[in-house]
Amino acid sequence: MAAEEKDPLSYFAAYGSSSSGSSDEEDNSEPEETSRKGQDTAKSAGGYGNKAEKRLPGPDELFRSVTRPAFLYNPLNKQIDWERHVVKAPEEPPKEFKIWKSHYVPPPETYSTEKKPPPPELDMAIKWSNIYEDNGDDAPQNAKKARLLPEGEETVESDDEKDEHTSKKRKIELGEPTKKKK
């Protein structure tokens, strides 16, 4: 009972002291000394020496005495007027719709894709001769240069034509591998 009458905070005040004792008697004496010092200072400071005034009421007693806050009390109506305490937010004016400014491309009228015809077919003989660089005597030639001459007449070739014909020929050494065009 003597321990219950002590100031409840004195235990924590004594617990933080720098001196540490190993026996129970020393531990019990420290809180008593600090509680006595606290009482002396309390009496001299304000005269609050009565422990009953310092004590807070228990939870059951507290909730029995306080049923609702004093600012909600209305002695005439005896009911809480919640509408008086409601705070409403200010109303915002409706926002006008504005079209975004952008440089977009409008969608096409129709979503069908145009069908392209397949490319014209190439003569496979010309294609294969170009791939394998087979420009020999048996390589296919364009039909535009073919013309028949009457017998006895010979064609006179200009210098430009001779240069073209010789530029197509090249020497290939036996040690070099042939290079393919891609």
From Swiss-Prot:
Basic and acidic residues bias locations: 51-61, 172-182
Taxonomic source organism: Bos taurus
Residues with Phosphoserine modification: S158
Keyword Phosphoprotein part of the UniProt annotation: yes
Family as reported in the entry's similarity comment: Belongs to the UPF0690 family.
Name of the protein in question: UPF0690 protein C1orf52 homolog
Keywords annotated in UniProt: Phosphoprotein
Acidic residues: bias regions: 23-32, 151-162
Modification Phosphothreonine, positions: T67
Endpoints of the signal sequence: none
Modified residues (Phosphotyrosine): Y132
The keyword Cytoplasm appears for this protein: no
Region (Disordered): 1-61, 132-182
